[in-house]
Each structure stands twice: as structure tokens, then as C-alpha cells.
Amino acid sequence: MQAYFEQIEKVRYEGSQSSNPFAFRHYNPDQEILGKRMADHLRFAVAYWHTFCWNGSDMFGVGSFARPWQQSGDALELAKRKADIAFEFFQKLSVPYYCFHDVDVAPEGNSLKEYLHNIAVITDVLAEKQQDSGVKLLWGTANCFTNPRYGAGAATNPDPDVFAWAATQVFTAMNATKTLGGENYVLWGGREGYETLLNTDLRQEREQIGRFMQMVVEHKHKIGFQGTLLIEPKPQEPTKHQYDYDVATVYGFLKQFGLEKEIKVNVEANHATLAGHSFHHEIATAVALGVFGSVDANRGDPQLGWDTDQFPNSVEENTLIMYEILKAGGFTTGGLNFDAKVRRQSTDRYDLFHAHIGAMDTMALALKAAARMIEDDKLNQLVAKRYAGWNGELGQQILQGNASLESLAQYAESHQLAPQHQSGQQELLENLVNRHLFG
């Protein structure tokens, strides 16, 4: 089979002085950071959809890419060709993982029977390619938002037949993910929301999606899937309002349906931007609530109100992300999936390499800076000092439920309390972070 990326043999680490655009300058997979290989900290994955399915189209123009697997012909054979090229890319990029939606890898077909057949065929193809290459599946998912049947949602659809079709897709995609050794399974409710409240029963739709997620958990245990279930929050787009608005909203939903011990979150940077949060906020919130699972590493444009899905290029922003992840013990089954696409004008096939190389170097630099912050420990010490009072007798009485409003009022009066504000030292902390970033 003729190589598609014939000009590249393999992307390798060459160091910060390298001028080779097809080399890593900072991502050295075998470099030891805090006692672990850099590759094992970062757990990079390529997104099948943006990299191999998007054709360069947008709301105002047709596709600008000329990918050979996107031409007319037998859909299943083209899907196999796409898999050939995808795994060529994974191996030449030296990336350990990939992620997919069901219909990214296999044509949907014109009927449920065709869909099931195509998924079965492509699952076998992917299994063979994983075996030959050593590339693994970080997570799989089902696309329950593109087909017109999902115009009013999948699990939240007013038609139970659509709900059943979506259940079939998730059932099939979960089984394929397990077969392929996937380490997670993701659920993103692209159209689980509403366009107008005039035709929407919020209570009904919430009960529907709650039951759907319970069935997903039941199926996970039934088939013995050992991976992590993940919900990916997003506030809007394509719907006006989505029910998985942000991490805190998802956590409230999980608590309502008794799923907070079963499902974690896959946090995307651009979705945080759309929700009016920083990426740092969403990661820290997920860690604080005990539901942090994985990351879709990309960036949005703060001046644009839609999901631009650009590759991450800010070491400053991502250092704080990696700091939170390292403090939490690092990834377990999750990783850094590049849910990002090259720009519509980036029509050269090798732009795919430039985009991923830059993103991987960005995250490597962020990891190294975050590790310096962990080793230095001054930031952590200053935060601990700020809350030290809660380790004392009064603080522990409050937290352990041994105090009431009345007892605290008596305490304040008897001790003639007159507490004074203590500086938050924000500027000192910002300087401390910059010192680790820039020396």
C-alpha cells in the first residue's frame, strides 16, 4: 500500500535547538518527569473526526480539503482506506492513542442493518491495525447528533423510537470500544438540550436522559467493561442550551440520578470558554468534585461565540491545567485528546503534522513547568497556610458537624472575636507561576 504521508518517516524528539518542522523540540516521550515517563503523564490521543472526517467545510463554504477517502465510491472500502491512512499518521506522529465516534470509522449506511454490519467489519479492521501498530484506543463514543433523526435530541427526544435508536448506537459503540481495549467511553449530548422552551418539557427530558445514563452504567457492568464512563460538558451549540452545561451542572445531574460514583467528566478547553469559564476553572472543579477523568485539549477564541476547536498553543494556560492534574495524581484511564482541527485554509496534508507537533510540544512544556511548581511546593504551601485555621479546634468542630449557629454565636461573643482580613497575595502567586514559566 502506498504511503499517504510519504515525505515523513517518523516524528522524533530532536531538542529545543532543532529547526526541523517535523521534529519535537520539547516532547521527549522517554524523559522522566516526577518519576514517570513524559509519554505516560500526557497520554496523547488523535481525534479521528477532526483529523480524518472533517472536509474543511463551514457554514459559508463547501469542503476545502481533497482527502482521497472522502471521494465518491464504496463507503466501506473508503472507510478502510481512511483507517490505513489514520494508522499511518498515528505511527509516524509517535502518538500512543486515538479516539473515535462510531460513524467516524464506519459508514452509517441506509438502515440499522447496514450500520451494524459496517461497525462489525471496521471493528475487526481497527483491531488488526492496533495489534500491528501498538496504537491503543483512549476512548470511543457514538455520534447521536448528526443524523436528522436527532434534530430534537437522542436521549431527550420526544419520540421513544429515536431514544431506542440512540440506545442501539451506544450499545454497539460501547461493545466495539470494549472489543478494542478502549480505556474510556464518552457521552456527549450534542443535541440533548432545547431550541425553545415553548415546546420543551424540561422535567420529562431530564428524566429521559437520566434513565439513559443509568442504562449505560448497567450495560457497562453487564459486559464487564473495565474502562471509565465520561460525560463531556458543553453549554450550547448546536442547541441553544445543553443540559450538560458545565462540570458543576453535570455533577448535579449525576447526583440526582445516583451516578456520581459511576461517571466522570471529559473536560474540553473550548467548551469551558463557551460556558464563560476558564479551562483552569473547569479542571479544578472536576478535581474538587471527584469526577475528573480526561481532557479534550484544544482552545477556543474568546472573541468568537462558537466552538473553533483550535490546537492548544498556550504554555501559560496549560501549565495551570497540568499543575491541577499532577496535584490530583495524574491521569488514570484518561489522557490528552486533541479535539482540534487545522484551519480551513490549511489544505496541505502535512499541516496535520504541524498542528499536532506544536500541540504536543506545548503540552510537554506545560508539563515541565507544572512539575517545577510541584517540586518547588511554594504555591501549595501558601494555599495551605491560607486555610490553616481550619485544621485547628474550631475549624474541625465546624467541619465535623459538632458546631451550630448558636454555638458559634456563643463562641464569637465569649471570645470577643474581631477577625481581620488577611491578604490573598494574588500578585505574589502570579509572580511565582511566572518564575516557573520563564525563569
Swiss-Prot record:
GO annotation terms (biological process): D-xylose metabolic process
Binding site residues for Mg(2+) 1: E232, E268, D296, D339
Keywords: Carbohydrate metabolism, Cytoplasm, Isomerase, Magnesium, Metal-binding, Xylose metabolism
Active-site residues annotated for this sequence: H101, D104
Subcellular location: Cytoplasm
UniProt binding sites for Mg(2+) 2: E268, H271, D307, D309
Catalytic activity of the protein: alpha-D-xylose = alpha-D-xylulofuranose
Cofactor, how bound (note): Binds 2 magnesium ions per subunit.
GO molecular function, one term: xylose isomerase activity
Cofactor(s) needed by this chain: Mg(2+)
CC per GO annotation: cytoplasm
SUPFAM superfamilies, alphabetized: Xylose isomerase-like (SSF51658)
The protein's Enzyme Commission number: 5.3.1.5
Quaternary data: Homotetramer.
Family: Belongs to the xylose isomerase family.
Protein name, entry field: Xylose isomerase
Taxonomic lineage from the root: Bacteria, Pseudomonadati, Pseudomonadota, Gammaproteobacteria, Enterobacterales
Gene responsible for this protein: xylA
